Amino acid sequence: MTNEYGKVSSRTFKHMKKGLVFMANHNHIENIYALPHIGSGHDGLVFEYGDLALKLLKYDISKRSKDKLMTFEKASFFCRNLKLKRIEAPIDILLDEDGIFSGYVMHRIEDLASEKYVGTPIAKKPGEFTCGQLLWAASELGEDFSQLSSKGIKAKDINAGSFLYPADYVHLCDVDKYQLSKDSSLERENMQKYRYTLAILLYLQMGQGCSKEELKALNTWVKHCSNNPAFVKELSSDIGSCFSEPISELASHKAKVLLR
């Protein structure tokens, strides 16, 4: 069996083979393009496969390595070493019919805030979840980021598009740019990313209807939170009496205090 260092596609999916095989359990997919398409990014397409999500990667190995995207080495390491609660990482690898690395498998997360659920009884907006759910998510995300540090993985490229909102509030997706690292600053940087993640969750609510000047102030606040070791503790304290209240109310209160 050849490895990923054989060439895969160039910069499009035009020449990608349809048939794929799961590396661990040898499940065979005759035509991945026949599966429901549920997501896209600059580096791949995501398809629904039962309770799993399959990411078909774009580009050949040289470009993916150069741009620090997902590689066979990284995906294999994630599969072997991670068991996360809120960050969706690879759980298996996809090979094409020639045994060449072509993508990876994740748990599929139902994003109740996506267009798919608009107008349905179970649709949610990010701010409709409760402060208690935020606190629960914060605890489990903290465990996940600590696990990343213990395994030598640096979280990268977390942005608004990284968030999914299932019934238990929030999960992070798109770990393609996460890096294997031995940097002495790894733990500190991951904790900054953790605090940044929680601040962004509130920012997405606080920024609704804000002027450019107010958004600039909110951006400054997010940066402050990322560098404030006590931010998570302060946030937990803020939640206190409004445990069952929607996150949007907490965010609205914070925005009024910050922007007045």
Locations of regions flagged by a protein language model:
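Protein kinase-like catalytic core scaffold
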Residues: 52, 104, 171-174
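Conserved hydrophobic "DFG−1" position in protein kinase catalytic cores
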Residues: 48, 108, 164-165
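A conserved alpha-helical element in kinase catalytic cores
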Residues: 15, 58-98, 128, 132
